[in-house]
Amino acid sequence: MVQAVWHTVQDAGWKNIKINEEDFKKISGLRKKGGFAELADSPKFYLWQGEKKFIIKTDSYRKNLKRKERCVRMIEDILKYNKEFVEKKAYEPYLTSKYPDKKLAILTCMDTRLTELLPAALGIKNGDAKIIKNAGGVITHPYGSVMRSLLVGILELGVEEIMVIGHTDCGVQGMDGHHMLEELVERGVSQEHINVIKSTGTDLEKWLGGFESVEQSVKDTVYALKHHPLMPTGIKITGFIMDSVTGGLEAVEEKK
């Protein structure tokens, strides 16, 4: 049975194969992991159990796996690594205080390309700066979590300078809020809930939408920070665009 399933999956490239409960019981080398069942002799293939039907999928096509399956495996890997990290005391090089040594806060994008590139390109080490990230590195609300975090950094942690850093090839540039709402409905969000939120005056399309120009977005964010009624005097605020490949920085002129 395992062999037959193996060949069917290999021939199809990627395919859901429903197996009834009786056939499932006949499969040897099976081990259960929570709500999942895994083929011990074929680690690339595993079964997902649901309503007395079992679906076999290939791990080489991760994008096609059910999100729940991917998350379970990913979290297991993370927890395993974390345990080893602590046991080996690999945390010791990162020991520092909560106060940024450079008295610097950076507002930037959550783009994965910047995770290691940005601090490396700026010479920022653990403990040097407060780094605040969101989609696009922008302020979507004058009294939202980004502004609050920056004020906490200034008032409680000694931040004296803020760098706003956008980057080239940003995924938020040109993002369509209307399309995102359609996708939310496809992903199971109730249209009724969306309509209720809109009825309160919330512009969800604008909230979910992106910007047309990275440079203009950085200018607008710097301007919003400098003219925010709660921004203390004496805080230096500057804007930059980072090359998402080389890490090179280009200063952005202040909005007039």
Each model region followed by its residue ranges:
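Divalent metal-coordination and catalytic microenvironments
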Residues: 106, 164, 247
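Short polybasic linear motifs
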Residues: 8, 42
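Divalent-metal-activated hydrolytic enzyme cores
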Residues: 72-102, 137-142, 157, 172-256
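Short, Lys/Arg-enriched N-terminal segments with co-localized hydrophobic residues
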Residues: 59-73
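Conserved beta-strand-loop surface patch within small alpha/beta domains used
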Residues: 88, 93-147
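Ordered, amphipathic secondary-structure segments that act as subunit-interaction surfaces
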Residues: 155-167
